[in-house]
């Protein structure tokens, strides 16, 4: 086991604080509408330019191990805020730095760290409740656009795109961000249920100019097994041909004679058929087939429950208004499924999301909810260079998370104003059990001005003057750093999602409280490099040349 270096008391805290400040100072320059960029060197390729707090935090490793421990703990604040709300990482870092700096001053003055921490916790709990009461629901498209704009660093085109996407696919829909091909941002909306399986044979194509298969008012046969014998599906084919409608077959696979017969029938115009593989694998495939069945009011023909494909009737087939199949995707538009059953299925999947511990599973389940409930929107980010593309995608991602958080828990005045208002409201109400807890409460409430002050500093203004003016105001009165004007923050469209501010404050206070109560730090001693004997011997070999 390696030897350890141990530091106690003030020595440990001074080192830790230095690390906290290095990381926080690098992150906080990005805060606000006039926040600056940070350039990150990469081992391969061009440097990354970003205004995303968590991206900056993740890059920082300090040489001194004690300082690095402080930096890593603040990095944890940014990561936690990012995981919880997807945004607010810089705000969380600024708050953590402010609470740690104020708290360690009090510890150095001889206060009891545990009482300080209890005071901080009381203040934070009271402010969180106050933020919830200040919060108003985010309902209109305009408000969603404003939240997106603020989070994307005042880029109104991003705000508009996100608002349009949410309008199209609903608040439950999946919105993804991809690299665009041009210079302009674009929004691509897929309505209905889409899954990533294309046609099994190009001979099914009936729209050659688009290279797709389009079926109007088709029947949909859902089968939970491979089909290789045409006899199995003959009864269904005959019934569908009699009804004069097209047929889409979704099965684990269709091969050999069965596929060849379907192609021949389609080419001769006897019956219009298309076949695709079922999406997903294993249990997920079964679940997705069931989703399609509920969406189209059909039944999955499965041998597991004693059903036979030869005995399938036309009543067991699903139906939809339209199906479009490309080389890679199948989209089912306007399935005739019962709304009540679809809602019940969505509720069931939501319960699975809550119970799941795997992020991957949660993401896949959320996709299923979106496909049943609304649709999928893709925001394609346009940029002139790859460096700009990365930076812009980061901002669009942040804005997307912020708007989701706003829809979930509502909105409050932005620009750090809500924290200042909440802090001043609870200042007279929250009381500790002793004077040292009261000091903890006061320092936590004072630290809540830090985001406002940092936004103003980044805009090149005098922080203490603006902070005093904002504190003298009431309600949503605050300072717009973008236009350098005072006014009602909600009317000016400067909004923050309540969830983002709340989680930033809670995570910052949690880690800061732990750092204030730190009394000892332990790290590995650096290993001494042993002299390389081989190198010395190599020099002697050179003597041979002198002879």
UniProtKB/Swiss-Prot annotation:
Instruction: List the EC numbers from the record.
Output: 5.6.1.7
Any one Gene Ontology BP term: protein refolding
Principal location: cytoplasm
| Keyword Chaperone assigned | yes
Q: Which InterPro entries match?
A: Chaperonin_Cpn60_CS, Cpn60/GroEL, Cpn60/GroEL/TCP-1, GroEL-like_apical_dom_sf, GROEL-like_equatorial_sf, TCP-1-like_intermed_sf
- Which family is this sequence assigned to? Belongs to the chaperonin (HSP60) family.
Question: Assembly and interactions?
Answer: Forms a cylinder of 14 subunits composed of two heptameric rings stacked back-to-back. Interacts with the co-chaperonin GroES.
- Its biological purpose: Together with its co-chaperonin GroES, plays an essential role in assisting protein folding. The GroEL-GroES system forms a nano-cage that allows encapsulation of the non-native substrate proteins and provides a physical environment optimized to promote and accelerate protein folding.
Q: What is this protein identified as? A: Chaperonin GroEL
């Amino acid at each position: 086991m390696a030897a350890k270096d141990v530091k106690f008391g003030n020595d440990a805290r001074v080192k830790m604080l230095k690390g906290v400040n290095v990381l926080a100072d690098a992150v906080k320059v990005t805060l606000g509408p006039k926040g600056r960029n940070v350039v990150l060197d990469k081992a391969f390729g061009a440097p990354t330019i970003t205004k995303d707090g968590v991206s900056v935090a993740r890059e920082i490793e300090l040489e001194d191990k004690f300082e690095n421990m402080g930096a890593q703990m603040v990095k944890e604040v940014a990561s936690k805020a990012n995981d919880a709300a997807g945004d607010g990482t810089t705000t969380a870092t600024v708050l953590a730095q402010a609470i740690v700096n104020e708290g360690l001053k009090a510890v150095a003055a001889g206060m009891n760290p545990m009482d300080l921490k209890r005071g901080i916790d009381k203040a934070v709990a009271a402010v969180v409740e106050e933020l919830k009461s200040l919060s108003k629901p985010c309902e209109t498209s305009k408000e969603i656009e404003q939240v997106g704009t603020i989070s994307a660093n005042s880029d109104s085109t991003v705000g508009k795109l996100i608002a349009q996407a949410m309008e199209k696919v609903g608040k439950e829909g999946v919105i993804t961000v991809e690299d665009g091909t041009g210079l302009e941002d674009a929004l691509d909306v897929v309505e209905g249920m889409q899954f990533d399986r294309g046609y099994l044979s190009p001979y099914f194509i009936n729209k050659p100019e688009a290279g797709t298969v389009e079926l109007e008012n088709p029947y949909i046969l859902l089968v939970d097994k491979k089909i290789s014998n045409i006899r199995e599906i003959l009864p269904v084919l005959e019934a569908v041909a009699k009804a004069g409608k097209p047929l889409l077959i979704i099965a684990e696979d269709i091969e050999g004679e069965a596929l060849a017969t379907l192609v021949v029938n389609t080419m001769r115009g006897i019956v219009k058929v298309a076949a695709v593989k079922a999406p997903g694998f294993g249990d997920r495939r079964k679940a997705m087939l069931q989703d399609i069945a509920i969406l189209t009011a059909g039944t999955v023909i499965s041998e597991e429950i004693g059903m036979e494909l030869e005995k399938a009737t036309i009543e067991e087939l699903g139906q939809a208004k339209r199906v479009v199949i490309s080389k890679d995707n199948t989209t089912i538009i306007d399935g005739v499924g019962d709304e009540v059953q679809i809602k019940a299925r969505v509720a069931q999947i939501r319960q699975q999301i809550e119970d799941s511990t795997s992020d991957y599973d949660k993401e896949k389940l959320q996709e299923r909810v979106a496909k049943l409930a609304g649709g999928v929107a893709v925001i394609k980010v346009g940029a002139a260079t790859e460096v700009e593309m990365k930076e812009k995608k980061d901002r669009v991602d942040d804005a997307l998370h912020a708007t989701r958080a706003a829809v979930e828990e509502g909105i409050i005045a932005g620009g750090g104003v809500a924290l200042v208002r909440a802090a001043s409201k609870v200042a007279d109400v929250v009381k500790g059990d002793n004077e040292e807890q009261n000091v903890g409460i006061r320092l936590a409430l004072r630290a809540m001005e830090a985001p406002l002050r940092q936004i103003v500093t980044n805009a090149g203004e005098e922080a203490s003057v603006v902070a005093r003016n904002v504190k003298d105001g009431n309600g949503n009165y605050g300072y717009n750093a973008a236009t350098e004007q005072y006014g009602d923050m909600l009317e000016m469209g400067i909004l923050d999602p309540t969830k983002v501010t709340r989680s930033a404050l809670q995570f910052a206070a949690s880690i800061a409280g732990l750092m204030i109560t730190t009394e000892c730090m332990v790290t590995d001693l650096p290993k001494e490099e042993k002299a390389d004997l081989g190198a010395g011997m190599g020099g002697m070999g050179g003597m041979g040349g002198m002879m």
